[in-house]
Amino acid sequence: MFHKIKNVFPLEDYKLLVQFISGVTKIYDVKPLFEWKEVFKTLKENELFYGVYVDVGGNGIVWNDYVDLSCEELWENGKEISTPFDGLISMSDATTIWGLNESTLRKAISYGKLKNGIDVCKYGKQWVVSIESMIREYGQPSK
């Protein structure tokens, strides 16, 4: 399975908090990479390390043209942590993961398949849906 990245946040002690579109959050320790390849030692410069961002498409993270990591490296070697938002994903991420149209999910809400306030909820302009309810109604993700 391909684990696309939604957000990355640099932390102290050369660690990264990585949020995947599947709703999983992991902590990735960059320090072991300093010994693996010379190019990663440049991350010891705090300005560069703290400039990390998710590449277009969520397939990895990037610091500059020479230093990047794939989403699979972060998934395989990151340590999963729990957060208050575990099990919740945005409706747009759910449509991507399950291969559905957003209108399909909106109809599921209006027909009562997904219950507002229990399975889905709107926060500001953003709808979030529980992964559990998506699996219940649409099965395991196709991707």
Regions found by a protein language model. Give the residues of each.
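Motif-centric detector for short Cys/His coordination patterns
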Residues: 1-126, 130-143
